[in-house]
Amino acid sequence: MTENITKLKKQLLNNHILDISIGLVYLWFGGLKYFPELSPAEDLAKNTITSLTFGMIPDNISIILLAIWETLIGVLLLLNIYRRQVIIIALIHMVFTFTPLFLFSEQSFNNSYFYLTLLGQYIIKNIIIIGGLLTLYKLSVTKRRLL
């Protein structure tokens, strides 16, 4: 009995490490956005949301909504609650994180589309998060089929 419990704990922990790491990133980045001028991505986020919503959402509201969105994703991933739904919401968010590459390409690239600015690198690194989220989604679908 104890051996089975140990195996189960190990399996749960191994599958949850990716949830925890992505959840912490979301919680951290989202948490910074609650405090004006603390997040290095604040201006980019405001400008992107303004462009995507055609200015219909004021900057001070949009950044708080984004902070809520990101911290909620982070908390739910950390707690492993509504896992599949949260992963889908996070993937949608990740798609939108790439829009500045097109909306503000002059800020994302230097001289060439292969030479990224620091801002461009900040955006491109989200590919890693997308890979992790897709892995988690695949695991959740596989787990659901087994049940």
What are these regions (language model features)?
Residues 1-72, 76-147:
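Membrane-interface extramembranous regions
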